[in-house]
Amino acid sequence: MNRVISYTIATLLLAITTARSSAQEATDTKQLQEVVVMGGKHKTLSNRGTRILGAIHMLTPDKVGYEVGSALSAKQPFEVEEIEFFIISNSIRDVTLQVAIYRDSTFTEVFSQPIFVNIPEGNRQTVVAKPTERILLQPGDYIVSIGLDDCDGETQQQWANSDQWDGQKRYQMMTKQNLQFPLYFKAGQIRSNPDDAFEKCPTNIGLKVKGVIHKPRH
């Protein structure tokens, strides 16, 4: 008897969950149907400014959780297809970066499924990250960022006490293990860990968000 009751309850819970999921999918579909593509017009959202020749933004293995990005504005509904950035060089093993877009006013992440990108060691890499879900940005202000999510465990162990190094030791390690980005002369956004708010800085690393402009249905 108890097994029958338990099975019945489980069946009801599954039915409720399925109904809620279907309702949410229907709502999402309706929201997407409320816009139409303006002739498939593609656009790049970028706020990078002028390249600073010879200048770099450097990440080291002790910067796990650190994010760097740019503030962007969408004037019309904008469907995100990919985020692009350039890496000058990488000498850190097994680097994983997380790519994110946040609503500027609340720092709420737009992606429900995080985007992770593995970066091999090497020079001059153009990285293209594509969302695994359909993302439609409503008109407003956003922050697009990349963060150092992870790297080789042995390397992290080597950097575990980096806050105790003197200047010479830090310089030696930084020249051996680093991830370098180009710098552009226009305000960017940085934060040391996900619990902090973003802060403005005078430069950015040239992130670009590519996609399609949409127009509200009248």
PLM regions with names:
Residues 119-126, 167-172:
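Short, surface-exposed linear segments at secondary-structure transitions and domain or protein termini
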Residues 1-26:
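Bacterial Sec-dependent N-terminal signal peptides
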Residues 109-121:
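Solvent-exposed serine/threonine-rich low-complexity stretches and specific carbohydrate-binding patches
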Residues 138-140:
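A glycine-anchored, Pro-Gly-centered beta-turn/N-cap motif
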Residues 29-104, 147-218:
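Beta-sheet-rich sandwich/jelly-roll-like modules and their strand-loop junctions
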Residues 142-146:
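Short, aromatic- and glycine-rich surface loops/edge beta-strands on solvent-exposed regions
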Residues 124-134:
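Exposed aromatic-hydrophobic patches
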Residues 24-29, 37, 107, 120:
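Long luminal/extracellular ectodomains of secretory-pathway precursor proteins
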